[in-house]
């Protein structure tokens, strides 16, 4: 497929023609079609000399980003079971849907609230575009919730500005600012009536394809409009909506953004890696080194195209560095069974930690070494 955000050319007919076979004309021209990812101008990068010393804040987007990627989306019963599993694992921030998008998305949120299914220490997150009627619908949907993150976004990449919205950067900033202004107004009105904890999250969608100075600029304007301060921190979510660079390039983007952002101490920097190049876990780990505080991902990496970052792999990798990730995957088989049943998707047998073959060796020499290792541990 062509590397263009959300403008994906169907490739089936190319496969049918055989052009994607080695020697096909399309493959021959591949290196000529693509423009190399532009590196970030940062010569004194600090992240390579750092180590991860603590887990990030975890946010599951299974019920929203993961669910919308399913051929057969989950029904209400399945979503509720999935939500309970996420709570049991220990996820404290859960994006439950896009309530202004459809009645089914609205239904899961209202069910969770009205049946009092959300633990007091869990914050639900709702996604909304920076559009007035959708924002108002979202505030109707969260009525009665105790702890909510309002996650609003608009696209900022060069390509989307030119092709989709036909706006310059000032026009895109205005969309974000208008949305932030309304969200603050509705939040103030709701808090005056009810005891509710509302936090803000803003995503410059397609951050990975946006000029870094423009990404910083739009986030700073949103912070100003929301009156962000140390006691009212904003989550700035930086999506690799389409993964376009190597993981070190992504880390450079995050470090550059963190350095340039005014009042960095008033922001929680969140990552939302996708796996188009197969390196979402590495990009997330290096992004944490570069200054990120929070990760949005899914169980086993379910998500659009090649998936979101896999929270299971990312979390369990931390044990190898002596870090408790704060998530409990001790019931891996039960978690995997729930995932496969509700999503109707299999977990790859080679999937790190959760795959059925990850503790299996077929090589005779490997089996011999494993047996000797077990014997050594038994007798030492």
What name fits each language-model region?
Residues 58-61, 94-96, 120-128, 148-152, ...:
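Hydrophobic faces of well-ordered beta-strands that scaffold small-molecule active sites
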Residues 76-89, 132, 136-201, 205-264, ...:
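Alpha/beta enzyme core
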Residues 105-126, 177-185, 254-269:
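Alpha-helix-loop-beta-strand connector modules within alpha/beta enzyme cores
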């Amino acid at each position: 497929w062509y590397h263009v955000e959300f403008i994906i050319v169907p490739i089936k007919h190319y496969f049918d023609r055989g052009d994607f076979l080695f020697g096909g004309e399309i493959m021959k021209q591949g290196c000529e079609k693509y423009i190399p990812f532009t590196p970030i101008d940062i010569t004194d990068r600090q992240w390579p000399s750092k180590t991860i010393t603590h887990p990030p804040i975890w946010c599951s987007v299974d019920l929203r980003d993961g669910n919308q990627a399913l051929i057969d989306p989950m029904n209400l019963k399945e979503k509720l079971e999935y939500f309970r599993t996420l709570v049991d694992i220990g996820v404290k921030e859960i994006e439950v849907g896009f309530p202004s998008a459809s009645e089914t998305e609205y239904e899961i949120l209202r069910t969770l609230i009205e049946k009092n299914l959300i633990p007091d220490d869990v914050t639900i997150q709702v996604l909304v575009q920076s559009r007035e009627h959708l924002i108002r619908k979202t505030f109707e949907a969260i009525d009665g919730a105790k702890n909510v993150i309002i996650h609003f976004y608009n696209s900022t990449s060069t390509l989307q500005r030119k092709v989709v919205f036909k706006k310059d950067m000032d026009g895109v900033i205005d969309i974000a600012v208008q949305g932030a202004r309304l969200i603050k107004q509705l939040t103030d009105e709701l808090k005056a009536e009810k005891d509710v904890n509302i936090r803000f999250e803003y995503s410059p969608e397609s951050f990975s394809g946006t000029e870094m100075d423009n990404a910083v600029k739009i986030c700073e304007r949103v912070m100003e409009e929301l009156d962000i301060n140390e006691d009212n921190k904003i989550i700035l979510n930086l999506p690799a909506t389409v993964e376009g660079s190597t993981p070190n390039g992504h880390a450079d983007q995050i470090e550059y953004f963190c350095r340039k952002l005014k009042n960095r101490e008033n922001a929680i920097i969140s990552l939302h890696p996708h796996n188009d190049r197969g390196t979402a876990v590495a990009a997330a780990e290096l992004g944490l080194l570069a200054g990120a505080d929070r990760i949005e991902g899914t169980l086993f990496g379910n998500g659009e195209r090649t998936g979101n970052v896999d929270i299971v792999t990312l979390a369990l990798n931390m044990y190898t560095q002596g870090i408790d990730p704060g998530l409990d995957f001790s019931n891996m088989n039960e978690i995997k069974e729930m995932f496969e049943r509700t999503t109707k998707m299999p977990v790859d047998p080679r999937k790190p930690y959760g795959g059925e073959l990850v503790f299996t060796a077929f090589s005779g020499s490997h089996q011999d070494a494993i047996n000797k290792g077990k014997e050594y541990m038994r007798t030492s």
